[in-house]
Amino acid sequence: MTNIRKSHPLIKIVNESFIDLPAPSNISAWWNFGSLLGVCLILQILTGLFLAMHYTSDTATAFSSVTHICRDVNYGWIIRYMHANGASLFFICLFMHAGRGMYYGSYTFMETWNIGILLLFTVMATAFMGYVLPWGQMSFWXATVITNLLSAIPYIGTNLVEWIWGGFSVDKATLTRFFAFHFILPFIISALAAVHLLFLHETGSNNPSGVSSDSDKIPFHPYYTIKDILGLLIMLMVLMTLVLFSPDLLGDPDNYTPANPLNTPPHIKPEWYFLFAYAILRSIPNKLGGVLALALSIMILAIVPLLHTSNQRGMMFRPLSQCLFWLLVADLLTLTWIGGQPVEHPFIAIGQLASVLYFSIILVLMPISGTIENQLLKW
């Protein structure tokens, strides 16, 4: 009799994805982030579901319903802070996962990479809409500022913004639709993640050396299940440390003030994980130019595979490209810092310099370094 694990139509899919999956024997801890993202997504959906049971998406009661969750609902405070800080952890894992893909040349799996970019956009949209829901000062003003950017689109901009708002300003209609979208998008993300995995399993995983590992595969279970569980325990420990010791560390104090359309906060800024893109947006004095730069800062990932000039896949044996990669990481950290600073000297100049460097590294310097390394290997 055949093992049910291998014959049952449903269990067979799980078996081929997580148990008998042939995996390269040399993949490092950088390959843990895929499973961590899956856990983050499940955690966010579950905590979000319980929050939605007590939340009301009405401008008059949204803020007080969040306060009610934290004060009166059994363990409501821990659910709320796990959801808020879980989002931060989600983005840390996302950035590391995408960074791993860039470093080791995983972007040569074009379908997987492009679905990944689509996932990044969807997660960013979900997080943005979730930030609006508590209806604090920063929720309201960030929603106003970010949605207003669409008015820079020629001809249809103003109509588009009013259509998204459901009126002439961010109000009850906006909050209600943002809640609806924030609820549905994680399920769309789950479907996209399944497609992401489907395309990945068509080709098999990449590995640090960038060389085909077909001759040296090991089963996913028990080797990588154990490895993933270790990563998961570390992540949960970080999350719970954050939630139980300093839950508001990554939040904004302004969001503890109920939304007031008549009072603008001195510094409007999004959550920390959007600051790099926000800094790029602010570094261009022209509105349309800033919006284009903002969109391109993420969409540029789609052309990374087309700019690959090296004869080697990953950067493991490419010291020049490694230097550029870590310069890019440092540049993104600089942009994140600048995004949280006021618009004044010297932050404006630093932001503009960091923005130019960001695009230069990806579009110009990395392809050049690949070509130089090819030449060096010939000599």
Swiss-Prot record:
A ubiquinone binds at residue 201. The chain crosses the membrane at residues 33-53, 77-98, 113-133, 178-198, 226-246, 288-308, 320-340, 347-367. It is a multi-pass membrane protein. Heme b b566 binds at residues 97, 196. It holds the Pfam family Cytochrome_B. Its cofactor is heme b. It is found in: Mitochondrion inner membrane. GO terms for cellular component: mitochondrial inner membrane; respiratory chain complex III. Keywords: Electron transport, Heme, Iron, Membrane, Metal-binding, Mitochondrion, Mitochondrion inner membrane, Respiratory chain, Transmembrane, Transmembrane helix, Transport, Ubiquinone. GO terms for molecular function: metal ion binding; ubiquinol-cytochrome-c reductase activity. The keyword Membrane applies. Binds 2 heme b groups non-covalently. Heme b b562 binds at residues 83, 182. It comes from the Eukaryota. Coiled coil: none annotated. GO terms for biological process: mitochondrial electron transport, ubiquinol to cytochrome c. Component of the ubiquinol-cytochrome c reductase complex (complex III or cytochrome b-c1 complex) that is part of the mitochondrial respiratory chain. The b-c1 complex mediates electron transfer from ubiquinol to cytochrome c. Contributes to the generation of a proton gradient across the mitochondrial membrane that is then used for ATP synthesis. Belongs to the cytochrome b family. Heme 1 (or BL or b562) is low-potential and absorbs at about 562 nm, and heme 2 (or BH or b566) is high-potential and absorbs at about 566 nm. The cytochrome bc1 complex contains 11 subunits: 3 respiratory subunits (MT-CYB, CYC1 and UQCRFS1), 2 core proteins (UQCRC1 and UQCRC2) and 6 low-molecular weight proteins (UQCRH/QCR6, UQCRB/QCR7, UQCRQ/QCR8, UQCR10/QCR9, UQCR11/QCR10 and a cleavage product of UQCRFS1). This cytochrome bc1 complex then forms a dimer. This is Cytochrome b. It comes from Herpestes naso. The gene is MT-CYB.
